[in-house]
């Protein structure tokens, strides 16, 4: 056998071996893929779709929800009966073809199974999502219905508990309750007949009406309590109080109080009747108006009761206060009469006291009898209070005025006595000032000083003349005393100034002798100053002249002399 044939045989054997090996590899790979698809199929088939379907089925769906559930349930049945069986057949075919090394057909079957599994997986996902939505939707609807029913049950319970607190609104509330019950029945009917949209709308309305009626029933008892309990009780209290006040001789400016009571009762009845419409805002507003009218009646009675207490107090004060004012005025008149014998009094004071007397008489005429027979008057105590307070203010003003007049006249005699003492003192001081000037032995007295001296003397004489009159004008005395006091003080200061200027000038003139022989300016000022000093008696001008000249040649000399003088200056000994 030739070598070529041997090589060919070897090559063929090798090809067969290689082909077999490749076939084995492909077969193993296909086995692996078929196994994976089998696992996937088992996984999909093992999903808890049946359990989820049973859960939704137990919800007892109705209407559109039930129809939708049936469609998805049927789809799952189709998948389990048809799709999974078909997939199982194709897997079997794929295994058979793979085992017989028919890899092309095996591959075709594998691809077919994979596509079917993808579709089944998508369908199962859709079914589960739909079931979840149906379950969630039904749970929401159930919770919503439960919530609405709970609200209604609470409303029923609340209405039953407060049955006696609704007054005239009870029939209307019962009517509204029946309407809500009808709406719930309508909801059940529509929901069962497969009209979920309209059923939902009806449920919404039923819930809204339940909430609204619940809010109304919560507010009604407070309104009814006012109309049936509080207002009638307050009105009964007012009427009984009014009768007691009339028995106690109270009077009122208003003459229609009984009519007002009737009007308030009618307003209460009217508001209670109209409350049946459940217009709570209007009812509350009307209640506020009724309460305001009742409060006004209370305020009226309380005002009169308070006025009675105040007037009773005033009625006790007025007689004694009036006597006090009369006594004060009599004493004031007596004192003014006594003082008028010796003094000229202010005419305004006399007329003021007469005015007090007139006011006291008016009070006595207008009020005294009212105060004494306080409880026997047929006018409201509030009006009596106004009258009493007005006249008490008058008496208070009279008393204040009396005190002012008394203060103005009580010290007249003391003023006179003090004025006489001061006048004597001023005369003595005038003589002492004159003696003080004489002892200075001045060349002469300045005319200005003489004018001040004689003016002061004249003012003292005027004061003495006024004090010596038969009837003393005390106002004039006070004025002249003040003038005399100021004049004496001014004369004393002027005296010290004249003496100081004269003394210092004389000392400086003597001191200037040091410079006269060689300072022409000092000599000239010396001559001028001597003329002013000895001839014109102008000591101030003389001092200014010589001090200025000396300051030019010896600065500070004037201050030295002034300081020395002030330390040793002699004072007038009064």
UniProtKB/Swiss-Prot annotation:
The chain crosses the membrane at residues 8-26. Residues 1-7 are extracellular. The keyword Ubl conjugation does not apply. InterPro entries: EzrA. It comes from the Bacteria. It is a single-pass membrane protein. GO terms for cellular component: plasma membrane; septin ring. It holds the Pfam family EzrA. GO terms for biological process: division septum assembly; septin ring assembly. Keywords: Cell cycle, Cell division, Cell membrane, Coiled coil, Membrane, Septation, Transmembrane, Transmembrane helix. Its main location: membrane. Residues 102-140, 243-379, 459-520 form a coiled coil. Residues 27-574 are cytoplasmic. It is found in: Cell membrane. NCBIfam families: PRK04778.1-1, PRK04778.1-4. Negative regulator of FtsZ ring formation; modulates the frequency and position of FtsZ ring formation. Inhibits FtsZ ring formation at polar sites. Interacts either with FtsZ or with one of its binding partners to promote depolymerization. Belongs to the EzrA family. This is Septation ring formation regulator EzrA. It comes from Streptococcus uberis (strain ATCC BAA-854 / 0140J).
